[in-house]
């Protein structure tokens, strides 16, 4: 087994509702609703779909006082920590703090006067709410645009440090920071620079990454690269797609780096003329059927005996394609043969049995350690 070489950057730990961010806390995955916030039913339904996909934290845009009231109604109907996304109007921040927000996404520099910022900080402190400073390459301050000519890593850093200084001077330290851009290299440069300057937890993201496919690639490169360097404490994959897809991709990135597991890690061959069954169809069916599984597990599905045995030996459950019957491995050992035409049903049954075994063992260990 290859040891994971990733060493996370030490950061302070803050709390977003029931979820800790930074320090030794797991890297959390979050998304943002794209419904009209005032449509409470639609927003709640979307949040619940994201939670089913594994979301640790959800963000909701609150552009008006009417939306703030809707936020309060949403807060009562979901249990996942909620971040209220606020711009310009400090009164909205004060309202959602009273309505039960777990975190405020604001930039202190665009909330208004020092007095307004102090009021927001006082409300956050009173309610035990954290904040996120969110710097974006598309909305840099005009003087920084003039100074640097274009968005640069240094410009994003300078903007972030301005906002950080405001909170530091008010002795408020329960915040995380993001410095997002739509360009992979700019994003990575900004986060690297920021990570050298502060010990606050960092919220990773590539903003306006694009549609599903291109946005996934951009995010995997930028965020995956930063995570490999130990940078990042929470993340959002920003896509022009459904928010639950963002959650799934976020966990796939973490899973690929061995940083966190959420469900099945499928190992499957790309298929060729040696395949003894239609690997693509089998994998599509398995991913759909087993989407609800949250227990970490490796499942290998290889269409022939060339690479199949080697992959199967490293998986919890492995299948090596053959006709008319395929060979099953369990925990790295040969187990039994199954009808190749019944692969999907048989693999699903084995996976669910294995999940039950693992969860029962986990429960017994918890009881044993607490007694």
Swiss-Prot record:
It is an enzyme of class 1 (oxidoreductase). Its EC number is 1.17.7.3. GO terms for biological process: isopentenyl diphosphate biosynthetic process, methylerythritol 4-phosphate pathway; terpenoid biosynthetic process. This is 4-hydroxy-3-methylbut-2-en-1-yl diphosphate synthase (flavodoxin). HAMAP family: IspG. It holds the Pfam family GcpE. [4Fe-4S] cluster binds at residues 269, 272, 304, 311. Gene3D superfamilies: Dihydropteroate synthase-like, Sulfite Reductase Hemoprotein, domain 1. One of its GO terms (molecular function) is 4 iron, 4 sulfur cluster binding. The gene is ispG. Its cofactor is [4Fe-4S] cluster. Converts 2C-methyl-D-erythritol 2,4-cyclodiphosphate (ME-2,4cPP) into 1-hydroxy-2-methyl-2-(E)-butenyl 4-diphosphate.
